[in-house]
């Protein structure tokens, strides 16, 4: 994996810079184990865990409140997180300046971090292929930026 210079701003080089959160997490499942870092917006709390993402069950569910939550959970429920798909509106994919490994950040519309996923460095070639499929990271312009759109109703 080639180290990249982190961008000062978010710029996409992808031809189709959108996907659903469900599709993105589905693509990341085989790249584990993944370190998941969940940020609590507005609170001084961060939760980190390393998880075998290949075992994730991914599910979207409309709640009685009208919100749609995406859940990633292990079968034994020892690991589980929920994201409001209306709040998680953007994702960046690139190479971490800190770890020099793969990094995916799920962001709010104002750019605040909700979730950071660090796929396994042993799966760097697979992550690089995923980046290339999405247009590749431009070392001068930074990470790939994806708009996260709602999953179409079936």
Stretch-by-stretch model annotation:
Residues 1-154:
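Eukaryotic intrinsically disordered, low-complexity regulatory linkers and tails enriched in Ser/Thr/Pro
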């Amino acid at each position: 994996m080639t180290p990249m210079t982190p961008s000062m701003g978010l710029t996409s080089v992808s031809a189709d810079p959108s996907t659903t959160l469900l599709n993105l997490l589905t693509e990341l499942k085989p790249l584990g184990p993944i370190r998941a870092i969940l940020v609590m917006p507005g609170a001084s709390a961060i939760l980190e865990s390393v998880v075998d993402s290949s075992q994730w069950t991914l599910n979207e569910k409309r709640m009685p409140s009208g919100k749609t939550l995406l859940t990633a959970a292990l079968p034994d429920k020892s690991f589980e997180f929920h994201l409001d798909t209306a709040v998680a509106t953007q994702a960046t994919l690139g190479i971490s300046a800190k770890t020099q490994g793969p990094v995916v950040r799920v962001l709010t519309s104002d750019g605040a971090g909700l979730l950071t996923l660090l796929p396994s460095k042993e799966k760097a070639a697979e992550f690089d292929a995923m980046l290339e499929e999405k247009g590749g990271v431009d070392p001068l312009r930074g990470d790939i930026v994806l708009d996260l759109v709602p999953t179409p109703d079936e």
